[in-house]
Amino acid sequence: MANVTLKPLCPLLEEMVQLPNHSNSSLRYIDHVSVLLHGLASLLGLVENGLILFVVGCRMRQTVVTTWVLHLALSDLLAAASLPFFTYFLAVGHSWELGTTFCKLHSSVFFLNMFASGFLLSAISLDRCLQVVRPVWAQNHRTVAVAHRVCLMLWALAVLNTIPYFVFRDTIPRLDGRIMCYYNLLLWNPGPDRDTTCDYRQKALAVSKFLLAFMVPLAIIASSHVAVSLRLHHRGRQRTGRFVRLVAAIVVAFVLCWGPYHIFSLLEARAHSVTTLRQLASRGLPFVTSLAFFNSVVNPLLYVFTCPDMLYKLRRSLRAVLESVLVEDSDQSGGLRNRRRRASSTATPASTLLLADRIPQLRPTRLIGWMRRGSAEVPQRV
């Protein structure tokens, strides 16, 4: 059968176009399970992140910490909102039926979430580092308004990095009639040597997103953690706050969900020159892409499960759960001081009783006699 498209395609994309639709019953069963899992994940992600946004944004006192979480939840909500369309793509037999424009928008949301998540986690780690290493500076400059401005700058940077993926995203017909939504690196200005153009652009995209959205954020997070640990060790403090544990859990989930995707993206870039990697890259990318999508579903669960006595507090309200986790370090220190004051105040009656026990006990008859005699001598205890 002749090629149904006149668009110039890179070698890897040409092989993907020629892949036939599988008719194996076991593979179709896997497709059905995949559609079910993605459908449940999309519903769960929308509900979870919507609740987090509502509670943190409308029902909690606004702090720098809640500002970070608010923007992180917004990024996850955007990714979760795109999951139903990806589920529809799977349900109709891995064919994109929603047009080229929506293909570009849908894919851009995925990459926007990828960059925004990495940038926001970096900002959270740096904020924690400044609190510990430069407490006076943080006290004077660390405000909710500044945090919002930083988040807006990070969103702008994420949008800027997403533009190439929007530009090169395209719909490509397959030989079996299905439609792919993938990036066509020869869509704009292919140049005289198409193989060189494909190889250069594919490696540039894979390496740039691997560095900017994964390795650089992890380096910032790791260096910030080391700086904080050294400073706390110098002060003789090793106590870890709840929000620090929450950030650690989110970072672990970020690495587990996005790490495989970046590895396969690098394999895909390498597959342009190493043909033996092409089948592995084309088969593995859909699975690791789904895993990356699920990161937006996992994060809201971490907000709740890092809270102690989670089930008890869930009976009270989601707000109580989040307020116990998204607490500023200064608030925790203040709470600790208040608890110490209450403990000292409860110890006062005991000390008073001890002092009273040491004061000589006066019998009424002896006290009356002493007052009649007008003696200046204090009666002795008997």
Swiss-Prot record:
<feature type="topological domain" description="Extracellular">
    <location>
        <begin position="89"/>
        <end position="105"/>
    </location>
</feature>
<keyword id="KW-1015">Disulfide bond</keyword>
<dbReference type="InterPro" id="IPR017452">
    <property type="entry name" value="GPCR_Rhodpsn_7TM"/>
</dbReference>
<keyword id="KW-1003">Cell membrane</keyword>
<feature type="modified residue" description="Phosphoserine">
    <location>
        <position position="344"/>
    </location>
</feature>
<keyword id="KW-1133">Transmembrane helix</keyword>
<feature type="short sequence motif" description="Involved in the recycling of CRTH2">
    <location>
        <begin position="329"/>
        <end position="332"/>
    </location>
</feature>
<feature type="transmembrane region" description="Helical; Name=7">
    <location>
        <begin position="288"/>
        <end position="307"/>
    </location>
</feature>
<dbReference type="GO" id="GO:0007193">
    <property type="term" value="P:adenylate cyclase-inhibiting G protein-coupled receptor signaling pathway"/>
</dbReference>
<dbReference type="GO" id="GO:0004930">
    <property type="term" value="F:G protein-coupled receptor activity"/>
</dbReference>
<keyword id="KW-0325">Glycoprotein</keyword>
<dbReference type="InterPro" id="IPR000826">
    <property type="entry name" value="Formyl_rcpt-rel"/>
</dbReference>
<feature type="topological domain" description="Cytoplasmic">
    <location>
        <begin position="231"/>
        <end position="246"/>
    </location>
</feature>
<dbReference type="GO" id="GO:2000255">
    <property type="term" value="P:negative regulation of male germ cell proliferation"/>
</dbReference>
<dbReference type="GO" id="GO:0005886">
    <property type="term" value="C:plasma membrane"/>
</dbReference>
<dbReference type="Pfam" id="PF00001">
    <property type="entry name" value="7tm_1"/>
</dbReference>
<comment type="function">
    <text>Receptor for prostaglandin D2 (PGD2). Coupled to the G(i)-protein. Receptor activation may result in pertussis toxin-sensitive decreases in cAMP levels and Ca(2+) mobilization. PI3K signaling is also implicated in mediating PTGDR2 effects. PGD2 induced receptor internalization. CRTH2 internalization can be regulated by diverse kinases such as, PKC, PKA, GRK2, GPRK5/GRK5 and GRK6. Receptor activation is responsible, at least in part, in immune regulation and allergic/inflammation responses.</text>
</comment>
<feature type="topological domain" description="Cytoplasmic">
    <location>
        <begin position="56"/>
        <end position="66"/>
    </location>
</feature>
<feature type="topological domain" description="Cytoplasmic">
    <location>
        <begin position="308"/>
        <end position="357"/>
    </location>
</feature>
<dbReference type="GO" id="GO:0006935">
    <property type="term" value="P:chemotaxis"/>
</dbReference>
<keyword id="KW-0675">Receptor</keyword>
<feature type="topological domain" description="Cytoplasmic">
    <location>
        <begin position="127"/>
        <end position="145"/>
    </location>
</feature>
<feature type="transmembrane region" description="Helical; Name=3">
    <location>
        <begin position="106"/>
        <end position="126"/>
    </location>
</feature>
<feature type="topological domain" description="Extracellular">
    <location>
        <begin position="168"/>
        <end position="209"/>
    </location>
</feature>
<feature type="modified residue" description="Phosphoserine">
    <location>
        <position position="330"/>
    </location>
</feature>
<protein>
    <recommendedName>
        <fullName>Prostaglandin D2 receptor 2</fullName>
    </recommendedName>
</protein>
<feature type="disulfide bond">
    <location>
        <begin position="103"/>
        <end position="181"/>
    </location>
</feature>
<keyword id="KW-0297">G-protein coupled receptor</keyword>
<dbReference type="GO" id="GO:0001785">
    <property type="term" value="F:prostaglandin J receptor activity"/>
</dbReference>
<keyword id="KW-0472">Membrane</keyword>
<feature type="transmembrane region" description="Helical; Name=1">
    <location>
        <begin position="33"/>
        <end position="55"/>
    </location>
</feature>
<keyword id="KW-0597">Phosphoprotein</keyword>
<dbReference type="GO" id="GO:0045745">
    <property type="term" value="P:positive regulation of G protein-coupled receptor signaling pathway"/>
</dbReference>
<feature type="transmembrane region" description="Helical; Name=2">
    <location>
        <begin position="67"/>
        <end position="88"/>
    </location>
</feature>
<dbReference type="GO" id="GO:0007186">
    <property type="term" value="P:G protein-coupled receptor signaling pathway"/>
</dbReference>
<feature type="topological domain" description="Extracellular">
    <location>
        <begin position="1"/>
        <end position="32"/>
    </location>
</feature>
<feature type="glycosylation site" description="N-linked (GlcNAc...) asparagine">
    <location>
        <position position="3"/>
    </location>
</feature>
<keyword id="KW-0812">Transmembrane</keyword>
<feature type="transmembrane region" description="Helical; Name=5">
    <location>
        <begin position="210"/>
        <end position="230"/>
    </location>
</feature>
<feature type="glycosylation site" description="N-linked (GlcNAc...) asparagine">
    <location>
        <position position="24"/>
    </location>
</feature>
<dbReference type="GO" id="GO:0004958">
    <property type="term" value="F:prostaglandin F receptor activity"/>
</dbReference>
<feature type="transmembrane region" description="Helical; Name=6">
    <location>
        <begin position="247"/>
        <end position="268"/>
    </location>
</feature>
